[in-house]
Amino acid sequence: MINVNDLKSGVTFQLEGAIYVVLEASHSKQGRGQANVKVKVKDLRTGSTTIRSFTGGEKVERAMIEKTNMDFLYNSGEAIVLMDQETFEQIEIPLNHVEWELNFLKEGQKVMVRKFQEEVLDIELPANVTLKVVSAPDAVKGNTAQAAQKKVTLETDFVVETPLFIKEGEEILVSTETGKYVGRA
């Protein structure tokens, strides 16, 4: 059991039959009242994100998540196909479990697969990934108050805003958490 005061980003726990991973956690205490803990969590089975509130001192059951390194092979249209790097076993994960992650996946990429008691839940990507720019319109510098940005399309068909100097064919770093441009690769 984990005390909710110990919940922080990355911790996994079970509650009401669901398995959650903490994305953000904030603690607040008002006057003489009891402390409250608000956590933004992702349900690893459905992929949905919600905010849960707990009163200080509550306990939740820890979920023991097994992580396995795998290679992304291809998208079959209904699921993504991954292969274990050691046993060469192939598994499929339905697309609705990895909608956001699909924006950053390219063939041969290494990912971490999260499993709970042999049930495949979802995949975990590195914080930043390197992707190639396939379409970058020429931007015209205008009268801008802040840094000018333009929309470019990446090799995964994901569209991201970048500075004007990014050109077609360049490789850039993109955050997998926010989907924003981080820098040149």
Swiss-Prot record:
GO terms for molecular function: translation elongation factor activity. Keywords: Cytoplasm, Elongation factor, Protein biosynthesis. The keyword Hydrolase does not apply. GO terms for cellular component: cytoplasm. It is found in: Cytoplasm. The keyword Cytoplasm applies. InterPro entries: Elong-fact-P_C, NA-bd_OB-fold, Rib_uL2_dom2, Transl_elong_fac_P/YeiP, Transl_elong_KOW-like, Transl_elong_P/YeiP_cen, Transl_elongation_fac_P, Translation_prot_SH3-like_sf. Its main location: cytoplasm. SMART domains: EFP, Elong-fact-P_C. GO terms for biological process: peptide biosynthetic process. Pathway: Protein biosynthesis; polypeptide chain elongation. Belongs to the elongation factor P family. Involved in peptide bond synthesis. Stimulates efficient translation and peptide-bond synthesis on native or reconstituted 70S ribosomes in vitro. Probably functions indirectly by altering the affinity of the ribosome for aminoacyl-tRNA, thus increasing their reactivity as acceptors for peptidyl transferase. HAMAP family: EF_P (MF_00141). This is Elongation factor P. The gene is efp.
